């Protein structure tokens, strides 16, 4: 047998350039790139070394023979001419893989059968012994590739694909293959950073593939050191002594690497179900002293190495499979960029994405981009230096716009620099006092309109100190204070949401219409908001699902803040906006009590309470609602704040869901509708009639020491007396109503319920 062999190293598409550098470094000679492969010449020692040390190859194929072929008979005889007795025993096992087509072979299964027949016929003994097929663990795995009329017959030295290192027995929903992860790390400069003693953090680590591959690179561990079964183990050309020598060298290098002070390598994962599988993978790789995995959200990501060293932040954000829609992904990327800018200054970052356009939403420029393929999906690796001069603020402006801004700044003699942001005790930004607005002549109001404007301004003044102190962004400024102006007016940052209550039949419709027009003329002036930002709806008594039906179809969402969280409201499309303002104190209470708890939100609507619970450090949140529309909205709210996988969203009838639920929760919030008769429900829900069954089912899921909060806005609601006989029930309505709803004490009622 020759001292030098032709080798083919296969790899994922896009890794050829990296693989040829690695292979040449390991001893491959006359190396050339091919599509998804590298070809070269090597000794048996180099072939073994490539099997052991290649972080990027899928397979190491040793070419046994090349021969021309025009038809199936040429294929059969070409394989038959090989001295197979030099490669395997007559009673051994084999598997055959065939790729390519042409020369009369248009079916790979047929081609594989012809190769198998030739090998079996060559080795069949007079006694009837012959090789058998074992597709899973054969003694030899033979590969034949048909390329433009030439057959390339090879022995697969690797056996199973080399990306299967043996440590990742548990994986998440959309894992990266280990060799692709290694390639991304190499392209990201991790070998250089590790050699300098730098740190590595993955804010979306899943089951830790990036972490383990990074640890093996840093500790000089051969990626396939722990593999026990190889494609050459039963090959008659195998040289055990040579293999043993190379394997022992790799063991010694790994021992020396692991004896060094471990680098700071940390992973954070939102989904609690992936934490232990990730830790198990790290332990199987022998890197428990180097790598730690914690539960954590992107929204709270902040790497803090022991010695304050900088390093590499690397991650593979979901492409849509895990989060569901593009809007959620947009918020995720925005949060990632925000955390990089705020918590990772002077670090390097590498973001591997199947949605490169979303990478632009991070607000940081990438200085290099590399193309990769994750299976059949084209992807980009964005390399980022987290430095202030790379931050992108605001929208892109033309040179003319920038010049106009400079001229305006010079004219005003005001430095064009951002002011330092200040925050109130609830974590909301305190808005700077705006410059005086230019004086614009306003249309003259009617007597009734002026009276209404005066009332609005009086209410604003009365609430101004409370609004400023609490950092309230959305609040009610008027709620039918004057009977002749029957409407509710809510401020949503710089928008106004007006709900006209349907006038009783005793009121002259013409007079009601005049008053409405007077009010609409007064609102922009009194609240100092452009009339284009005033949204008006009529609120009537709702029945069935009418309260959830679309009023319009603009699909415009506005972002508001409350208690340090960001929420999306839609002021146009539905009667309600996605945020029940009267429940603000309840949401703040939940945020304060949620730390470390399992939170359940029933009839969750847009899951604003779940967002507050996640902000407060809830161990997990589960939100249940019958409406897919509102659950999609809820997903956006969670993603907007960087909360994702550990926050479950369940579509279903709450009563049926509770009957099938077997989990326990420490904190439960129930805010049911007064009435519901959706087609997706088995029956009709009536809060007065069904309250006992609902609360009993929920209390059965309440953990020891847990708290259930029950609230509803049915004005005639009466809590059943027998509930207080079984549970500790305390009405807390007064503490759940803020000053903006103090004029309407019946806006809702709320109770705290615990086990006796």
From Swiss-Prot:
Q: Name the PROSITE patterns on file.
A: THUMP (PS51165)
Instruction: Give GO terms: molecular function aspect only.
Output: 23S rRNA (guanine(2445)-N(2))-methyltransferase activity; RNA binding; rRNA (guanine-N7-)-methyltransferase activity
SUPFAM superfamilies hit by this protein = S-adenosyl-L-methionine-dependent methyltransferases (SSF53335)
Keyword RNA-binding assigned to the entry: answer is yes
One GO cellular component, as annotated: cytoplasm
Q: Where is this region: Disordered?
A: 395-441
Q: Where is the THUMP domain?
A: 46-157
Q: Where in the cell is it found?
A: Cytoplasm
Per UniProt, the ranges with Basic and acidic residues bias are 395-409
> One matching Pfam family, short form?
Methyltrans_SAM
Q: What is its EC number?
A: 2.1.1.173, 2.1.1.264
Q: Which InterPro entries match?
A: 23SrRNA_methyltr_KL (IPR017244), DNA_methylase_N6_adenine_CS (IPR002052), RlmKL-like_Mtase (IPR000241), RlmL_1st (IPR054170), SAM-dep_methyl-trfase (IPR019614), SAM-dependent_MTases_sf (IPR029063), THUMP_dom (IPR004114)
Q: Which UniProt keywords apply?
A: Cytoplasm, Methyltransferase, RNA-binding, rRNA processing, S-adenosyl-L-methionine, Transferase
Instruction: Give the catalytic activity.
Output: guanosine(2445) in 23S rRNA + S-adenosyl-L-methionine = N(2)-methylguanosine(2445) in 23S rRNA + S-adenosyl-L-homocysteine + H(+); guanosine(2069) in 23S rRNA + S-adenosyl-L-methionine = N(2)-methylguanosine(2069) in 23S rRNA + S-adenosyl-L-homocysteine + H(+)
SMART domains, alphabetized: THUMP
Primary enzyme class:
transferase
Q: Does the keyword ATP-binding apply?
A: no
The entry assigns this protein to a family as follows: Belongs to the methyltransferase superfamily. RlmKL family.
Q: Which PANTHER family match?
A: RIBOSOMAL RNA LARGE SUBUNIT METHYLTRANSFERASE K/L, RIBOSOMAL RNA LARGE SUBUNIT METHYLTRANSFERASE K_L
Q: What's the stated role of this polypeptide?
A: Specifically methylates the guanine in position 2445 (m2G2445) and the guanine in position 2069 (m7G2069) of 23S rRNA.
- Name of the protein described by the UniProt record: Ribosomal RNA large subunit methyltransferase K/L
